[in-house]
Structure formats: C-alpha cells, structure tokens
C-alpha cells in the first residue's frame, strides 16, 4: 500500500516513486527491502546514485568489482552506473534504500547489462562465520 500526504512543510510517503516524489525533493525513489537466505535478487545499476542503510542482518554485497561484508548499521553507497548486488546472506538483510535525483533523460528503476542479470538469482545462504 502506498500512501502520500502532502502539506506545506511535511510530506509522508510510505514508498517513494518518481510519480509520488514532491517537486522539491532530490530523491527519485525510496523504500524498505528485505532479502532472506535463498531469496532472490538481481545484479543491476541505476542512472542515479543509490544508498542502502542496513538495519538488520548480515551478508555479502558487491559494488562494482568489489565484494563487502555488511550488516546492521552499514551504509552501502553506489555511484551512478555502477553495478551492485546482494550476493549472499547469513541473516535476513533488511534496510532502507533511496536513489538520488535521476538526471533529465535518465531512466528509472533497475537497469541491466545482460538478460541473465535481469532474471535475477538465488541469494546464497552463508554459514556461521562466513560473513
């Protein structure tokens, strides 16, 4: 369910999208995500910067050519055009994402370099001590 309430000083949006974004906002989209072991995710990129603020779980994420161990309290910062992915999860990974402003002519949402990336993949479970 998406709900938006706008007045002069405050906007409350449960899930932010380009259609619901207040005109003064630099955020293209935002929301909550949850990825479980054996869940699905996709390697993708955006025409804007994206940020994940993680509040639960542990796992491995890739940003560009590097892989990082992440957990609650970490912020994953992905520059425009850089592929990123949730590779594996030890404990259900939960976080808040937001995308910066998409430039004029930019595309919205997940973008893919290959058809295989667009299909997504199973997020491998990690054993204790692997992440």
Locations of regions flagged by a protein language model:
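Short, charged/polar surface micro-motifs in flexible loops or helix N-caps
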Residues: 27, 36-39, 58-60, 67, ...
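Ligand-binding loop in jelly-roll beta-barrel domains
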Residues: 80-107
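Structural motif
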Residues: 51, 58-60, 67, 83, ...
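Short, conserved beta-strand element in jelly-roll/cupin
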Residues: 34-36, 45-61
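A short, N-terminal "cap"/entry segment at the start of jelly-roll beta-barrel domains
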Residues: 1-31, 42, 110-131
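Short acidic-glycine-tyrosine-enriched beta hairpin
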Residues: 65-80
């Amino acid at each position: 369910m998406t709900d938006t309430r706008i007045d002069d000083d405050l906007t409350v949006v449960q899930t932010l999208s380009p259609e619901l974004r207040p005109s003064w906002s630099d955020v293209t989209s935002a929301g909550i995500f949850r990825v479980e072991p054996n869940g699905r995710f996709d390697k993708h990129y955006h025409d804007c910067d994206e940020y994940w603020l993680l509040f639960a779980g542990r796992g491995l994420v890739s940003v560009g050519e590097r892989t990082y161990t992440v957990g609650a309290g970490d912020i994953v910062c992905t520059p425009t055009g850089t592929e990123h992915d949730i590779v594996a999860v030890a404990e259900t990974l939960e976080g808040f994402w937001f995308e910066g402003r998409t430039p004029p002519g930019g595309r919205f949402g997940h973008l893919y370099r290959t058809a295989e990336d667009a299909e997504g993949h199973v997020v491998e479970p990690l054993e204790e001590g692997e992440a």
